[in-house]
A protein has these predicted regions:
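Short amphipathic alpha-helices and their capping/turn segments at secondary-structure boundaries
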Residues: 51-55, 78-90, 119-127, 211-216, ...
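Active-site acidic/histidine proton-transfer and metal-coordination neighborhood
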Residues: 10-19, 25-29, 51, 85-97, ...
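Histidine-acidic metal/acid-base catalytic patches
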Residues: 2-34, 43-57, 179-285
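Charged helix-capping and loop-helix junction motifs
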Residues: 77-81, 111-118, 146-157, 209-215, ...
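Active-site-proximal loop/turn and secondary-structure-junction residues that shape catalytic pockets
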Residues: 41, 66-68, 101-104, 137-141, ...
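A generic structural signal for short coil/turn motifs at secondary-structure boundaries
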Residues: 71-74, 107-108, 144, 232-236, ...
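Glycine-rich, proline-tolerant flexible connector loops at the mouths of alpha/beta enzymes
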Residues: 65-83, 140-144
Length: 285
């Protein structure tokens, strides 16, 4: 593993405390923005092959799925966690994030099974060296025009937030809601461990002024960012990435940018993501 790959793995997957002083002595600098991609965008959700693909693309990390429709346990199993850590080490690619996309079909707002998933995701995040856990609120878990569902989520997050706080893990809400609606939920929970997982494309599709929303939410309420397009390569669709870059700079955001979607119809994933990675690095780095 070369020096650059060592840094990637250290940041994404975590190394022992013994290794950290060594890195400090080497004065390795973590870049302001690190570039990852969702495992479900570069292959099937929950596939360990995502690390090898990410290496081919030139990514710094992979946002991995906690579980899948076929395997509700998956990364909640310590043995599976170790196989992922080994795969990340072999590829020289880190863990850029953790996501519970299965909540879209088995909703957190109403299905009690998901309480354990969210609680376990905090432990998994710690094991993988991940800071943020994406909680997905789309499809069956949509919070729009659902005050009862929103209140249920607030109550659940209030209950689990202390565990996340103790672990130093943030639970990120990704939904169709506007910035003010997200703020209302976050303020009601009242925990630094619950923030917005901001998707620039989803919010654009909803007609929100994403540049204003990013600035209004600020770095204290945005835990992480999806850089996404639907049916276009990045930089060729609806989202003005140069303005996104400026807005994120204005709020002093530092952290992962996760590429999602952004494959034109009929095009292959690998060349599309090589192009997407080049575009994002050209703008943000």
């Amino acid at each position: 593993m070369n020096r650059r790959d060592l840094l990637r793995y250290t940041v994404g997957a975590g190394l022992s405390a013994v290794s950290l002083p060594m890195l400090a002595r080497q004065r390795l600098i973590i870049p302001r923005y690190r570039i990852g991609a969702c495992d479900w965008s570069i292959g099937p959700a929950g596939s360990i092959d995502a690390f090898a693909v990410a290496k081919q693309i030139g990514l710094d990390g992979v946002q991995v799925s906690l579980n899948t429709a076929a395997d509700h346990e998956h990364l909640r199993n310590p043995a599976t966690q170790q196989t992922y850590i080994d795969a990340a080490r072999k590829a020289g690619v880190g863990f850029s994030g953790l996501a519970i996309g299965l909540l879209n079909g088995i909703p957190y707002k109403s299905d009690p099974r998901t309480d354990e998933w969210v609680a376990d995701s905090i432990d998994v995040a710690q094991a993988l060296g991940v800071k943020n856990v994406l909680l997905a609120f789309f499809s069956e878990n949509d919070l729009r025009n659902d005050k009862a569902g929103q209140q249920a989520v607030i109550d659940k997050l209030k209950a689990i937030a202390p565990k996340a706080e103790r672990a130093g893990v943030v639970l990120g809400i990704e939904s169709w809601l506007s910035a003010p609606e997200h703020v209302a939920i976050i303020d009601a929970v009242g925990s630094s461990a619950v923030k917005v997982y901001y998707d620039v494309c989803n919010s654009t599709v909803r007609g929100y002024d994403i540049f204003r929303e990013i600035r209004d939410l600020g770095k204290d309420r945005i835990c992480e960012v999806h850089i996404k397009e639907n049916g276009h390569l990045l930089g060729q669709g609806q989202v003005d990435l140069n303005k996104v870059h400026q807005a994120l700079n204005d709020i002093d955001y530092k952290g992962w940018l996760q590429i999602e979607g952004a494959v034109p119809p009929g095009q292959e994933v690998l060349p599309s993501y090589i192009a997407n990675n080049k575009t994002v690095r050209g703008i943000f780095q």
